[in-house]
Amino acid sequence: MKEWKAVALKYPENAEAPFISAVGKGLAAEKILEIAKEHSIPVVENEIAADVLSVQEIGSMIPENTWEIVAQIFSVVVKYEKM
């Protein structure tokens, strides 16, 4: 059985790119998803992004090679918020 991964991102207005605000695997990933649901934070499932971002340091800016895929994720979130 595959272990779930979750990565929470924060994108401050003046930042060059989003930052990793939380990372979890297994039960920790489930907790991140639970907190997101409790606070009506949109969740986007993207296994490739989760694999790459889940090994980054919490508080670090996302790697430049992930900017395009993360931009696509944020695009989905913005569309969701406009609904």
Predicted segments, located by residue:
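Divalent-cation
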Residues: M1-M83
